Each structure stands twice: as C-alpha cells, then as structure tokens.
Amino acid sequence: MADQIPLYPVRSAAAVAAANRKRAAYFSSAGPGPGADRPSRYQLEDESAHLDEMPLMMSEEGFENDESDYHTLPRARITRRKRGLEWFVCGGWKFLCTSCCDWLINICQRKRELKARTVWLGCPEKCEEKHPRNSIKNQKYNIFTFIPGVLYEQFKFFLNLYFLIVSCSQFVPALKIGYLYTYWAPLGFVLAVTIMREAVDEFRRFQRDKEVNSQLYSKLTVRGKVQVKSSDIQVGDLIIVEKNQRIPSDMVFLRTSEKAGSCFIRTDQLDGETDWKLKVAVSCTQRLPALGDLFSINAYVYAQKPQLDIHSFEGTFTREDSDPPVHESLSIENTLWASTVVASGTVIGVVIYTGKETRSVMNTSNPKNKVGLLDLELNQLTKALFLALVALSVVMVTLQGFAGPWYRSLFRFLLLFSYIIPISLRVNLDMGKAAYGWMIMRDEHIPGTVVRTSTIPEELGRLVYLLTDKTGTLTQNEMVFKRLHLGTVSYGTDTMDEIQNHLVNAYTQTQCQAGGSSAASTPPRKAPSSAPKVRRSVSSRVHEAVKAVALCHNVTPVYEARGAAGETEVAEADQDFSDDNRTYQASSPDEVALVQWTESVGLTLVSRDLTSMQLRTPGGQILTYCILQTFPFTSESKRMGVIVRDESTAEITFYMKGADVAMASIVQYNDWLEEECGNMAREGLRTLVVAKRALTEEQYQDFESRYNQAKLSLHDRTLKVAAVVESLEREMELLCLTGVEDQLQADVRPTLEMLRNAGIKIWMLTGDKLETATCIAKSSHLVSRTQDTHVFRPVTSRGEAHLELNAFRRKHDCALVISGDSLEVCLKYYEHEFVELACQCPAVVCCRCSPTQKAHIVKLLQQHTGRRTCAIGDGGNDVSMIQAADCGIGIEGKEGRQASLAADFSITRFKHVGRLLMVHGRSSYKRSAALGQFVMHRGLIISTMQAVFSSVFYFASVPLYQGFLMVGYATVYTMFPVFSLVLDQDVKPEMAMLYPELYKDLTKGRSLSFKTFLVWVLISIYQGGILMFGALVLFESEFVHVVAISFTALVLTELLMVALTVRTWHWLMVVAQLLSLGCYVASLAFLNEYFDVAFITTVTFVWKVSAITVVSCLPLYVLKYLKRKLSPPSYSKLSS
C-alpha cells in the first residue's frame, strides 16, 4: 500500500482519474493536425509509469516532456498567472508601480554595451571608444542629493510618512493641538539622528574613496616616468606598480624586475584566497633590453569584452614591427586584476579595463537589505495599531453625532490619538540592536566576533535551517598527508619511514648505476633470489609515485632573504637550500600538503620558476627538470598536469593528477582504483589520482605546435585548447592514489549536537565528493552513525528523478545525501516535492555543489518553508550563500576574509555558533519583543486616557496633556527604564547553553504575536481607564488637579510595569528607575504651567496618586504570580 500513496497528497486517485479523462477527451477532440503522425504523450510514457508507484505531479504525463511543457514548470512560476482584483488590492499595485519605476530608470540609465577592444601600448589616445574613469565611488549621495536622498529613504516608509503628515498638520490653525514642538521635537530628533549617522557614514565613504583615488602611481611615457593619480589612469597607459602596492586597474602583465619573468600577487581582497598567485609577463616585452624600449615597438593587446569571471581571460599580444609579426596568446596568468597586491618585484602593465569595467567592480554586487522577522512582525502590529487609530477616531466622531465640520473633528481625533503609534518604537529598537551588537563583540567566550549588520541580531534567535560549508567551516582546512596507495601496497602515517627507505635505496641504486656506466665497470650482479627483485620493484614504484607527486603541482618555494632589503625571492640553484625560512606558496592547501609530505620523506622541492624546477634527493643531489607545459586545475576539468624534461636523461614525461571521477577514464585499466577511492573517502580523506605518460621528442613537438595554435584562437579558445590537451590524456600509467585528511575543527561534534537539540535542521553544502562529504557528516555527528542514510542515485532525466524520489519517499527519518547534478534535475521537474521531502529529513548533505547552487538552495528553503535560514562558510565560494540567507555568518579562515567581510556576523571558530545563537540570539529576540511591546503599551495607555477624557467631556477634541508633558513622557520620564529591558534575561547564559531546548520555543514566535499583543492592548485599556477615571473621581475642584494626579500616576505605573516585566535585575536597571523618578520629581518645580505646586506637595495628592497606581498595577502583579504558580514557563523551572 505504501507504494500506492502519491507523494503529492492533495490530489486523490479519483481526481487524478478525472483529470486523465479530461485530458484524453481534449486530445481526442483536437483532431488530426500537423503532428498527427506523432505518437501521443501517453504512448511516450515510460514503462515505469505502469508500476504501482503513483506519479509525483501528473500521472498522465510522459516523463520525457519538452522543457516548455506547462506541467513541468515549478509551481512558483505557475502561480504567477493567477492575478486578479484581489491580487491588485492586496499588494499587486506596489509591484506594478515598482515595475514601472524600474522600467523608467532603465530607460533613463541605459547601460553601455561592453565590447572587446584593441589597446595600443602607451597610446591611450588611439582608443576608439570612451571608457569609464578609473575612480572608485562607494558614496550613495553627493552634496546636492544628500538631504533629499536621506529624507526619501526615511519617508518612503509608511509610519515615518504618517508622523510627517501629523507634524505638518500643526501648521494649519484649525487642526493645531497644543504646541508645535510636541510633534516636531520627537520627529526632529529621529531625523537628526538619522541624518547625522548617514552623514558620518557618507563622509567615511568619501574619505576612503578619496584615499584610494588619490594614490599615486608611476606612469611610463616617452619622456620618462611621471606621477599620476589612480583616478586619472586611462586605458592604454603603461603603469609601474611597486612591491606591496595595490594594482589600480585591470592590466596585462608586460615586464617585471624579477629575472624569472614572473611575480607573485596577493588576491585575498578579490577572491578571498590567501595563497599567492604566480603571474607571468608577456615574453616578447620581458625580453626587451630596457624599459624605454616599450615605446620603440609597435604593439597592441586585443582583449575580450569585460566579464565577471575573475578566473579566465582571452586575448592576444601582437607586435607588428617585427618580421614576421609576433603573436602571443594571453590567458589569466598574464593578467593583473585591480584590487590585488604585488607581492614580489616591480611590475609594468598596460591598462585594459578601468573603473566600472574592472573585474573587482563588476563582481561587487549590492547585497540585499536584510530585514529581520521581528521587524516585519512589528510592522504588521503597527498597521493594526493604525487601523485601531482610525477606528477609534471614527467612533468618537460618530458618538459626537457628526456635528459641525465632522471631517475636521475626525482629523483632530487622529492627531489626538496619534500616540497609539509610537514614533519612539524605531528609535528604541535601533538603540537596542546596537546594544546587542556591543554585547556580542564584548563576549569573552567568543573572542574575535564582529557584528557587521547591526539590524538583525534578533534573527539569530529565530533560525530553523542552518546551511554550512564543509571545508574550513566544519574542518580546519589544514591538510595532512595520511595515505599512499600503490594498488598492491598501502602506506599510512605509521609506515612513512618505509617510503623514505625505498627512496634512499632507489636513488642510491641510480647513483651507483650512473657511476658504474661512466667508469665502464663490471656489470651489476644479479639478484640471488626473487625476493630482492620484488623489493626493487616496490622501491621503483614508490620512487616513481613520490617523484610524480613532487613534480606535478603549482607550488613555488619562497625564501625570505635575510639581507637589509628584506625582500622575498625564489631560491637559485646555487643557494643553500637547507635554509629554515623556506615556505611554500600554492593555490590550494592540498598542493602544499603533498609537497610538504615529499619533503618529509626525503624528496624536497627547493626551487621553481617558469621554466624549471629543482628537487633535492635524500643524498643531497640536486635534480633539475625543465618545465615544458603546465595545465592548471579548473573546476570543469577537475585535474591538473605538467610536462617536464629530465635534464640528466632528456626524458619527457607528462604527469597528471586529479579527482577520481576525472581520472578514471584517463588511466589504464585497473581493478582497484574505484574501490580504494571509496575506502579512503569513507575514512574522510580527500583523494587524488596520480598518473604519468612518457613522451618522445616527436610526440611532444607535434603536441606543442597544435597547442600553441589553439592558444592563439580568438574564438572558442578554451574548447580548442582542452581538445588538444585531451589528445595526450589517454592510456596513462596509474602511479598511486593519495589521501589527505582535513581535520575537524575543535568542538564541532558538541556544537552540532547542541544545534540539533535546539530544533535547528542542519544542511551541509560542499563542493567535495560524495564519499568524503558523507564521511565528514558522520564523523562530525551531523548524521549519527546509527541513523539511516539515503544516497540519492545519479539521475539525468525526469523519469529517473521520479523513480528515485518515490524510493526516497518510502524511507522515514533518514538523512539525505545528494549530488549537485542530481539536485539540478530534481529541482527542474519536481521542485516543490523535493524540497518538501528534504525538509522532513533530520539532515541533508549536498555534495559537488557550485556557489550558485548553494545560494539557490537557500532561496528555495525561504520560498517553500517561510522559515528563517542561516548560512555559514569561510571561503569566497560561500559569499553568495551567505548573502542570500536571512542571517549570514562568516568564519575567518585560511581561505581569506571574503566570506567574513560579506557576512552579517563574523566569527573565528565554528564552535562559537552555539553561544551566538543559544545565548545572544535568544536573548536579543526576547528582549526586543519585550521592548517593542512595552513601547507600544506606553503609547496605548496614554491614548486610552485621552479617549476616556474626551468621552467624559462630550467628545471634545481637546488634548489631555500638552507641551513638555508629552515630550517628557516619551523621553526622560520613561525612556531609561523602558530601554533598560535590553539588559533583561530569563535564564543565565550557562543554562541556555546547557538546555538548548529552550531555543526551540522561539521559532514559534510566542514572545511577539497577535496573542501577546492583544494581552498588552487589554492591559493598556484597563490601566488607562483606571488612571483616567480614578483621577476624575478623586479630583475636587480644579481641572489642573486632574492633570497632576493622572500624569503622576501614569509615570509611576510605567515604572512599576517595567519592574513587573523584568525577570533578572541588573544594577543599571535600578539606576534607570531611580534616574527617571528623580528627573520627574525634580521637574515638578519647573512645571508651574501644568501643575499646581501647592497641591502636589500635600498629603491628599500623595494618597490619591498612590491609590490609583495600586489599583492599576496590583491586579497584574497578582495575575503574574498566579500564572507562575499554575502554568510556569519552561525557563522559570531552570531559573528557580
């Protein structure tokens, strides 16, 4: 029976059958047409459709439908067709207005089409088109648009616009109520704070932009070097960049002071990677005798149009004044992108892109303006308050009998009750958010934490899904070599000394053979038995494997010079290579780990430049290899290779290493590679397959000519180059399989356990292979070892996805492991169903995920579940995911600071996530919920008093309190105690960490909901009525006594309500209470205009105020006591 349950439960079997009959009738009634000879869709159905399995969406559909088929579209796209009057009234008008405005803006600011260009060296005047200025501008406004822009940003929100209209209405004599400053002072304070904050931020941006744009660079001209500002650099200029200087624009690398014709650059501010990148100068210009000779040649660079991809470039360098003309292909290794830093030597480049066309600017996207769920909920409540305001005003006018100009009375009542919507709500919440951020950064238990987005700290307390990267986030990104497998023998960490012995034996025999052949000595004696032959065979294989690992990489040893200059340079062959200050630079930690391992077993990389590398054997002999070609690693090919020539033997060898999925079809047939890759992956090791192929001189010469020709192609260069390289990647000899371990970070297991107990579902999104990702998920206890795991089989069609989803549907409480390719197919056809099933899993592991897929998964969870998501990562490939999530957390790791800088919160260790969420996230949400509701209570209670007062006095639209009383009530009299609620806590941080189940209650939003809001409304109505009626009943003769009694009781009631709300007292809370009370008592002496000073000093005044205050507050204290006794909250059991 389980097989017959449809995955999409809304459609019953009868409904499906009815739909089948309707569609069959439709197709049969359509009659023959142009496609009559084509079989129907029912005839195209897979045989699998006749299984007992019910289909996921439409049982009558064939699996192999056209992509444009309506029924295969995601539901999010289908629902867009349902637009009508209801859609327009409920918000569709906003969408239409926004679309029209965007259309007009696009028409007015039409982007210039980007084109390829020809750039002549040192001749910017030859540029055929005008290019953007090379200036950086991060400012949002200029001197003319600052005030209008800031005001627009404030008043585009309904509430701020409402307060502006209310304040402006006081200029109309017929609508004026009290003093102008009663309304303009709070609004002016909010605007002044906002304008000052924006002005400071804008001035800082201006200073940063000015500093960058004013940096001086040396520009090479016919007359020599001249100093030029960065903002004045043009396309075609020859710019000289010194060591440790930022590259001002995108350039082609022409010359360097380094003898090797290459230099290192740091790209951490561009791609987030901390490893240095090797860049190569154009050989034609590097060979010129002098720097000034650049103007004696007639040369140009052809560059492709500006693009986003920072890892690719296609262009050509042409020198026309030589015979024949020189043509060199240009690739990414010949470029110097803006915002990178020269790490060695001095470089000269020709500018090809400036300003907005540089790679760094084009990849700088404006992240979405994140709005917290609490802010959205408060916005809904304020809309409800506005409706209550309008309803109350209409009721008052109705009871008044619409006498006289009723519309004027209606507007005056709207003004009188305007305090229902407190203008101080936004100010208090913003100040509270700033306080939460300060507390987070001051927490000694999570040192180094930085709050970069101060507007969403409450989001940390409402998370349901946590999406995390693996490498560098759950793991340390510190690679340690653990395993070498040769097929018949495997070496681990405890047997590395055997590899060292094999290397010593191999190189000793090589030296003896070389010495014996040169001296024409007697031939070597044969081995006495077969055992030595086996040992020599193993030694030879180990030697070949280690040598391949030591040669096939992109690692460069760098030595810090001890001289006065203190510059970093590559060691030469005649240097002392035993220097302790040697470091390895590479594009990946895996590469460094492999080279460090070969050094540990005796084969050391001591030198490398563009054309050669040198190895030192265990016996101290230096081996020199000429680098003929290098094929760097790409995410598409998943492998890298190098062709080298042994200088001593003239042998040419092609070495290659890569992922098993890429290398399996390249190496010769074997029966152990797939099995051992799986075994290593289950141990949590990152595997690489190493292979080689010997080449003859003729073979290499033929390859080189075809390779160089392909590199000069202007169209489809990448494909043509890949095709030529693939011609070599055939029947390669499998040498070994390496295993590198990426160790888990400290306290990852207890942190994940804590998050799981808090009700947070954790998804791991990684670009690593399936086996490794699964192993890390189990070793980190993301997936418990006793928990079932469903590995989603690779699917490529809709039918396969259908069957696999049905197989997954029958499993319960199991973790899901799926690859990025299979995920893409499932989302194409069954987006809603897949997300619905995946969200039911306790854990999900997505492997082989691209950065865009990571961000897409985050958006899918937001769209289909409506729950709050958090993304955490440490690399540049996690930035899109972090920015797409409701709350982004970046870890400062070995892959750089790009993720950290793009995140809302930055931490140094994954284990800090636990305290960040359980303590600070939980406290921030509960504090802001209490603060927001209390501020609304403060406005509701005084509006209730105004309503009672107006009702008693024949519905007159006369204010109860005027002038400074209203301003003081919203500020000095109650602001400090109310704001002190940001220090409140229901449980101690240690208890919140010990019992993460407390966090689970927050996801239900019970601390701030319409239920709690209605409770506060009832409290406000009760207290406002008691205060006003009590004052009216107890006053004797003068009306001013009513104001004195009611207002004093109101202030005391607010202070007592804060005390009632507080759960854990802080000394600053006591100070705030006493300070506010002291300010009010002291101000009584100066409020002769509002109070009778002689009356407020009498005992009668004191007992009347005390009686009214007790009646308004005592029942609430009793109710709170009874609730704690009869139905205590979960946290009270722990705090007691």
Curated annotation (Swiss-Prot):
Disordered, as annotated region: 514-538
UniProt key word DNA repair: no
GO biological process terms, semicolon-separated: endocytosis; phospholipid translocation; retrograde vesicle-mediated transport, Golgi to endoplasmic reticulum
Binding site for Mg(2+): 469, 471, 874, 878
Binding site for ATP: 469-471, 591, 633, 638, 657, 686-687, 766-768, 848, 854, 877-878
Membrane topology according to the record: Multi-pass membrane protein
Known catalytic reactions: ATP + H2O + phospholipidSide 1 = ADP + phosphate + phospholipidSide 2
Active site per database record: 469 (4-aspartylphosphate intermediate)
Essential cofactor(s): Mg(2+)
Pfam families linked: Cation_ATPase, E1-E2_ATPase, Hydrolase, PhoLip_ATPase_C, PhoLip_ATPase_N
Extracellular side: 167-174, 405-408, 961-962, 1034-1041, 1088-1098
Transmembrane segments: 146-166, 175-195, 384-404, 409-429, 940-960, 963-983, 1013-1033, 1042-1062, 1067-1087, 1099-1119
The EC number(s) this enzyme carries: 7.6.2.1
Cellular component, GO, one term: endosome
Alphabetized UniProt keyword annotations: ATP-binding, Golgi apparatus, Lipid transport, Magnesium, Membrane, Metal-binding, Nucleotide-binding, Translocase, Transmembrane, Transmembrane helix, Transport
UniProt GO MF annotations: ATP binding; ATP hydrolysis activity; ATPase-coupled intramembrane lipid transporter activity; magnesium ion binding
Location in or out of the cell: Golgi apparatus, trans-Golgi network membrane
Ranges per topology, Cytoplasmic: 1-145, 196-383, 430-939, 984-1012, 1063-1066, 1120-1136
Family: Belongs to the cation transport ATPase (P-type) (TC 3.A.3) family. Type IV subfamily.
Name under which the protein is recorded: Probable phospholipid-transporting ATPase IIB
Gene source species: Bos taurus (Bovine)
